[in-house]
UniProtKB/Swiss-Prot annotation:
This is tRNA U34 carboxymethyltransferase. Keywords: Transferase, tRNA processing. The lineage of its organism: Bacteria, Pseudomonadati, Thermodesulfobacteriota, Desulfuromonadia, Geobacterales. It catalyses: carboxy-S-adenosyl-L-methionine + 5-hydroxyuridine(34) in tRNA = 5-carboxymethoxyuridine(34) in tRNA + S-adenosyl-L-homocysteine + H(+). The gene is cmoB. HAMAP family: tRNA_carboxymethyltr_CmoB. GO terms for biological process: tRNA wobble uridine modification. CDD domains: AdoMet_MTases.
Length: 323
């Protein structure tokens, strides 16, 4: 399993001894070979990755690890095959020793939309909830964040993060396989908390907001991205079944309803800083994510509707401060 000793030490330094002890007791089982049928294959691919020292690392403008020249005699196609063992790659893109990992999502576009509107990350401790493979966490580090902890329950996401961490060797960025419900309540130790693409998957969105609030120190900033619908303060859409072929979409609020939720949960300085209708260019199938994607989820005759006839995905980014 991955060595999280640096994480445990950092949590202790943050006054979170009990959480560090809890993670020490639970993470080994979550990351054991028996935890999923695919873990053995992932670990085999991980161990087969070649030892390469990147001559260049870029995290501020994009995520670039090394150059093609760093490969030397290493077979590029064999390296691609090892990376493909971690298919599907959903969040990115990554430039990995000259190999373009063209992920399903252009996560860099979302980052560019939100970065001008949030508190500067320099020196901050950040929690990234539902972080996927940690792409945005790398960008947070590139923006100067002192410490980034990503949480995501999907083991493939953690394995993809470990692929990058194998070469970046960043002791201040970690991704662990837990959900927000496994985080102890009222930690009050993070300067910034991100929750992007999570809220509408929660059966109790207000409980999720309280969980996020509990992780923040007083005066800390929440950055939340979620699906929204057009409408007034009373407008909240609950799909009667699937939404864009997803079974686990529960509540989609209007901007005004989302603002009210944040107010009722005790946040202040609330703002909707960006809205964006998801495009086929931003979310699509690629050679690195060969399953269905947005084009398959929309009405083929009306791009403003999902395949079920609901409003097509419209996303908003909110910022708010914990009192």
């Amino acid at each position: 399993m991955s060595n999280y000793d640096a994480l445990y030490s950092q949590l202790v330094a943050m006054g979170q001894e009990r959480w560090a002890e809890q993670l020490q007791a639970t993470l080994p089982d979550k990351l054991a070979l028996e935890s999923t049928a695919k873990m053995a294959g992932w670990q085999s691919a991980m161990q087969s990755l070649p030892e390469i020292r990147p001559s260049r690392i870029e995290l501020k403008e994009n995520v670039t690890i090394g150059t093609s020249d760093d490969l030397g005699d290493i077979n590029r196609e064999e390296l691609i095959a090892l990376l493909q063992a971690f298919h599907p790659w959903r969040k990115g893109p990554y430039n990995f020793f000259g190999i373009e990992i063209d992920t399903e999502w252009r996560s860099d576009w979302k980052w560019e939309r939100l970065l001008p509107h949030i508190q500067p990350l320099a020196g901050r401790r950040v929690l990234d909830v539902g972080c996927g493979n940690g792409y945005h966490g790398w960008r947070m580090r590139g923006a100067g964040a002192d410490f980034v902890l990503g949480i995501d329950p999907f083991l493939l996401s953690v394995q993809q993060f470990q692929v990058m961490q194998r070469y970046l060797r960043d002791p201040q960025h970690h991704v662990i396989p837990i959900g927000i419900e496994e985080v102890p309540p009222n930690l009050a130790c993070f300067d910034s908390v991100f929750s992007m693409g999570v809220l509408y998957h929660r059966r109790s969105p207000l409980d999720h907001l309280f969980e996020l609030k509990g992780c923040l120190r007083p005066g800390g900033e929440l950055i939340l991205e979620t699906l929204i619908v057009e409408g007034k303060r009373e407008t909240i859409f609950m799909p009667p079944g699937r939404y864009a072929k997803m079974r686990n979409v529960w509540f989609i609020p209007s901007i005004e309803a989302m603002t009210l939720w944040l107010e009722r949960c005790g946040f202040t300085d609330i703002g909707c800083v960006d809205t964006n209708r998801t495009s086929r260019e931003e979310q699509r199938s690629t050679g690195w994510m060969r399953f269905e994607s947005l084009a398959d989820f929309l009405d083929p005759n009306d791009a403003e509707k999902t395949i079920e006839g609901h409003p097509a995905p419209l996303r908003a980014i909110f910022t708010a401060t914990k009192l």
